[in-house]
């Protein structure tokens, strides 16, 4: 049951753009995990740039730097 939680700076994405991105992300998981479409979910969460460190980097990224499959090229 993969769930993808995309946290990002505000982009003013339309519902259609979100749908296309979600379908693309789901296709990757279907290909590499063998997941069915019904088992996948995707969320989009806009985070203001001035809140990124407190809401994303410090609680989610920093504690898992050693195990991230793709590490960011920035730090705080």
Swiss-Prot record:
Cytoplasm among keywords: yes
Molecular function via GO: intramolecular oxidoreductase activity, interconverting keto- and enol-groups
Residues forming coiled coils: none
Taxonomic source organism: Pectobacterium carotovorum subsp. carotovorum (strain PC1)
Assembly mode: Homodimer.
HAMAP family: Tautomerase_PptA
Keywords: Cytoplasm, Isomerase
Active-site positions on this chain: 2 (proton acceptor)
Gene: pptA
GO cellular component, one term: cytoplasm
Listed name of the protein: Tautomerase PptA
EC number: 5.3.2.-
Localisation: Cytoplasm
